[in-house]
UniProtKB/Swiss-Prot annotation:
Residues that bear N5-methylglutamine: 151
Known function: One of the primary rRNA binding proteins, it binds directly near the 3'-end of the 23S rRNA, where it nucleates assembly of the 50S subunit.
PANTHER family: 50S RIBOSOMAL PROTEIN L3, LARGE RIBOSOMAL SUBUNIT PROTEIN UL3C
Entry's Gene Ontology molecular function annotations: rRNA binding; structural constituent of ribosome
Protein's organism: Methylorubrum extorquens (strain PA1)
HAMAP family reported for this sequence: Ribosomal_uL3_B (MF_01325_B)
Entry protein name: Large ribosomal subunit protein uL3
Coiled coil regions in record: none
Gene name as annotated: rplC
Subunit structure, interactors included: Part of the 50S ribosomal subunit. Forms a cluster with proteins L14 and L19.
Matches recorded under SUPFAM superfamilies: Translation proteins
Length: 246
């Protein structure tokens, strides 16, 4: 089980396949997603990675958090999240996870905060059918109708679906296909819509319901201390120096 990443939702666009068909995609951007800490079985009772993304102002970071970032030797991060991983998928602290951590064709689960829609009625919030258009109904066409019984039970139960605030909830969309990645610009293009507004934080992880492709990098693609990580492609050997003229 590999680590996920934190990305920022840029927006939607479309890309074209070799057959000329257009595919709607959501563009996600990774901005210096670094490993901040490890969670181990001996110390914490479980195995996980804490990753951070974005750059936070030092004045907005508490003294305790500054100490944690100093131990990890990373700059203060704006957004933190933990991802459960297996012991063989631990990435070194301070390493930066790149966009090619995911490969085209694999499926991912994305988690974000849904767009806020304010106070909504029962028809929009819960897909109620509303009342009739005619036959004595006036003004109340979109009302929810009765909310309780008669003398028994004589009350409206808790958690009854009623009008109220809609949106701003944690939403996970499963099995989105990775269409393309751009490691140089830190972009991940996934097919379809992703919850949340443009500029919102999105957690991206391997799909839990789809089989992981055999060629995905393990423990992942990352840069360690400004150089390529263990799973990255090794650098090409240097060309031999030319001989000087006599």
């Amino acid at each position: 089980m590999r680590s996920g990443v934190i990305a920022r939702k840029v927006g939607m666009t479309r890309v074209f396949t070799d057959a000329g068909e257009h595919v709607p995609v959501t563009v996600l951007q990774i901005d210096q997603c670094q490993v901040v800490a490890h969670r181990t079985t001996e110390k914490d009772g479980y195995v996980a990675l804490q990753v951070g993304v974005g750059k936070a102002k030092v004045k907005n970071v508490s003294q305790a958090e500054r100490g944690r970032f100093a131990v990890a030797k990373v700059e203060p991060k704006k957004k933190l999240a933990e991802f459960r991983v297996s012991e063989d998928a631990l990435i070194p602290v301070g390493a930066e996870i790149t966009a090619d951590h995911f490969i085209p064709g694999q499926f991912v689960d994305v988690t974000g905060t849904s767009t806020g829609k304010g106070f909504a009625g029962g028809m929009k919030r819960w897909n109620f059918g509303g009342l009739r258009a005619t036959h004595g109904v006036s003004i109340s066409h979109r009302s929810i109708g009765s909310t309780g019984g008669r003398q028994d039970p004589g009350k409206t139960f808790k958690n009854k679906k009623m009008p109220g605030h809609l949106g701003v909830e944690r939403v996970t969309t499963q099995n989105l296909k990775v269409v393309r990645t751009d490691p140089e610009r830190g972009l991940i293009l996934v097919e379809g819509a992703v919850p949340g507004v443009a500029g919102g934080w999105i957690q991206v992880r391997d799909s839990v319901k789809r089989k992981l492709p055999a060629d995905v990098p393990l423990p992942g693609k990352f840069r360690e201390n400004g150089s390529a990580g263990a799973s990255q492609v090794e650098a090409a050997p240097e060309a031999p120096a030319s001989e000087e003229n006599a």
